Amino acid sequence: GFLDVVHVGKAVGKAALNAVNDLVN
């Protein structure tokens, strides 16, 4: 459902932010 898509989107966003954080630090 729509909420599942939102949940997956948030998870992907967090993973991307963490990856960028690791590269910066």
UniProtKB/Swiss-Prot annotation:
Got a GO cellular component term for this one?
Answer: extracellular region
- State where the protein is found: Secreted
Tell me, in one coarse class, where this protein mainly resides.
Answer: secreted
Please tell me in which tissues this protein is expressed: Expressed by the skin glands.
Give the domain of life.
Eukaryota
Residues with PTM Asparagine amide = N25
Q: Which UniProt keywords apply?
A: Amidation, Amphibian defense peptide, Antimicrobial, Secreted
Quick one: a GO biological-process term for this protein? defense response
> Which portions of this protein are annotated as coiled-coil regions?
none
| UniProt record similarity statement | Belongs to the frog skin active peptide (FSAP) family. Cruzioseptin subfamily.
The record describes the protein's role as: Has antimicrobial activity.
Mind telling me what this protein is named?
Cruzioseptin-13
